[in-house]
Amino acid sequence: MNYMMTDNEVFKEGLAGVPAAKSRVSHVDGTDGILEYRGIRIEELAKSSSFIEVAYLLIWGKLPTQAEIEEFEYEIRTHRRIKYHIRDMMKCFPETGHPMDALQTSAAALGLFYARRALDDPKYIRAAVVRLLAKIPTMVAAFHMIREGNDPIQPNDKLDYASNFLYMLTEKEPDPFAAKVFDVCLTLHAEHTMNASTFSARVTASTLTDPYAVVASAVGTLAGPLHGGANEEVLNMLEEIGSVENVRPYVEKCLANKQRIMGFGHRVYKVKDPRAIILQDLAEQLFAKMGHDEYYEIAVELEKVVEEYVGQKGIYPNVDFYSGLVYRKLDIPADLFTPLFAIARVAGWLAHWKEQLSVNKIYRPTQIYIGDHNLSYVPMTERVVSVARNEDPNAII
């Protein structure tokens, strides 16, 4: 619903479609299905680049030279380890806690260990970028191991970024093709213009706080079910469907009841999500190499049936539809799917943090007040007693 404020101001719920920044970081054309990072098509980057090179491109605004990428990779490899204080803090977290909550807390805690310096200091910016890219995956893997009752697996400096994360979950070097698929998944999730978590990052950055608080803010936003977690819900849906034979009845039931089919449709893309096209091809290769399972067969049939019914309305699989299948095939627990999103999106958040600093003006929107006016203060003895709720008075809230 829109509410007119003045001749030049319009209120929109959720700021839907309202430009909140000018940016050079990424571009989406939802009509033609185009996603570009710094002007380069995602298809080219997925085919020819690596996640670390893509992170460099997003954050520094250009493709690195051989010397630049080697230095960047070396810096990240040598900063992967986290301080034992962080590990000890994680051991105090409840093992039933969600990994995103653990990640948000741990990311914020990094700011305690690295002195805040001037945000116009290139060395400070470089160090913060390296630390966050290097340590976020380690923190995700460490909390997972700790909640399982195990000691965290130390990073393997011989392995690349994607391979090292998979190694820290199992202490086994991953299959090279599986690691490559995971690396492409990180690239596909690294950035996607202005969304809730990126907006949160830019708002936080605009206050000139430290970059660890910026990333913690974005992680907290991504943790919400309306933003992250869709690929986990796709797996829950596939489990509910149960078999290929149940796909068509399930789709018909959802359409009849106007229920959402997880992993389909996008607020921006009116055609098939270009990231989903890339992931579909990679998933086919991965399952061909490592063996099909029933989830994959159900997903293939589901895509076919959904497109048959509603493809003409521009409802196609999005990136979440296949990413969950890929992560499951890589033996990654489902509740780590959103932390994986965060690992990748740190690159985009840092790019927007750096861009916000270059043109900074603190975000200060306004509101439309819709409450009461001119009410009188009522003394306690004259207030109407509300009906007591049936709650345990001794319960801890």
Curated annotation (Swiss-Prot):
TM region(s), chain numbering: none
Single GO cellular component term: cytoplasm
Pathway: Carbohydrate metabolism; tricarboxylic acid cycle; isocitrate from oxaloacetate: step 1/2
Single Gene Ontology BP annotation: carbohydrate metabolic process
KW Transferase (keyword) present: yes
Top-rank lineage group of the source organism: Bacteria
Note: Citrate synthase is found in nearly all cells capable of oxidative metabolism.
Family that this chain belongs to: Belongs to the citrate synthase family.
Protein name, entry field: Citrate synthase
Originating species: Synechocystis sp. (strain ATCC 27184 / PCC 6803 / Kazusa)
